Amino acid sequence: MDILGATLRVYVDDLEKAIPFYEGLAGGRAMRSERGGVEVAAVGCFLLMSGPESQLEVLRKVAATIAVTDVEETLRAITSLGGDVIAGPVPTPAGRNLIARHPDGAIYEYVDRRA
């Protein structure tokens, strides 16, 4: 399993107001999507999220989003090391993801770019 990088989750009240700041900071354009009533904008290493508190409450439990080469390989590594998969793997607009709980209780999202 190769870890390619991590994305910092930022929860904002107003996505439209937040995007210009993070675009300027990261030096890139936001890639937007929507899932389950939550608006998302990926800008560099930041993942901005805005939506209903009931949805954000669940998302806030995830410490970070970690990019990997292959979600299936990651699933095998996590479970063999004593972690468990809470959700997924499922398709996303960019590839696939899963949510896993590590043996210490920390929860992470793992994503790949495979279709």
Predicted feature locations:
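Vicinal oxygen chelate
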Residues: 1, 79-115
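Conserved short beta-strand elements that form part of the metal-binding/catalytic scaffold
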Residues: 28-61, 107-113
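Conserved active-site tyrosine of GNAT-family acetyltransferases
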Residues: 18-23, 78, 105
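N-terminal beta-strand motif that seeds the catalytic metal site of vicinal oxygen chelate
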Residues: 1-19, 62-64, 114-115
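Conserved acetyl-CoA-binding loop of GNAT-fold acetyltransferases
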Residues: 24-31, 82-84
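Acidic di-acidic motifs
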Residues: 14, 70, 102
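Mid-chain, well-packed structural core segment of small domains
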Residues: 64-87
